Amino acid sequence: KPQDRPNVAATLASLSIPLHLSTPEKFNPSQHPEFNQQRIELSPRSASSRIKGYTLSIGAKLVGITEINPLWIYAKRGEIFHENWDDWGREIELNHRYAVVFATEMAFELVGTAPHSSTTIASMANYAGGAFIATQLAAYIANLGYSASANHLRHYDAALVPLAVDAGLGETGRLGYLMTKDFGPRVRLGAVTTDLPLIPDNPVDIGVEDFCRICKKCARCCPSNSIPLDDQEAVNGTRRWKLNAETCFDYWGKVGTDCNICMRVCPWSHANTLPHKLIRALITRNRYSRKLFNLMDEIFYGKKPKPKSAPEWARYE
């Protein structure tokens, strides 16, 4: 729609990252930076601390480390960018043992407008920010003398949600996204795989599976019925709620955005105010709290919450 063009312009601008942050000879943000031949020796504990601290300092909200489960690695390259057709169908060979997985927070005021175009601005801004973080982190590890590969919007060697679960960032929710304690599903993920010896984090239990069994709000509100109302099922050696990706993506095409309705209505997606922080803390600890606050969420916000108005700068004229 013509009145939506300013938001489309902002969405596209969110993906406009510079090709070079310094001189081309100094730094070129590739997925596989050449590593320094003079390796800097670090203990796994020291390396893990430095890597996490650096990742948070350049914009990540959450970061964790895991040993890579081979099941999460994609078999072949399935997306083509910049007419690089030689890459299509190429087998992915990943010899890295560890993954550093991070999350960035999506803006609450933009996610709250889903499925309108302003929510896509938040998505693309986080994809671009994640690309920056992954690229810089991969370069940092390479400068230490180790092999590294940046995983972001334009390059994925592995499925990031199960990697993030293994790295202790959260649990997989009914809607198929990673559910984090502090932001719910309102995050975007990135990762760097590496052979730098690190100390893995442990998966966490924050009560997501139990809460999602009770809630089902994302499934009730999904306009394409892509999120199951049933229980988890066995899928490729895992047990999870199986999203219908085809009908979900088809609705994206119809609505012209990446929808995000499930993310908007999720009770874990509320702003990080003191009351909501307290509620999340109780939900992670007590099953009865999950039932109580699920009921309270429906009382205060409704069974099918309506989208909020976009910020003034992102509204239709």
Language-model regions: role of each:
Residues K52, K61-R285:
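Catalytic cores of enzyme domains
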Residues K1-P70, Y74, G78, R264, ...:
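Iron-sulfur (Fe-S) cluster-binding modules
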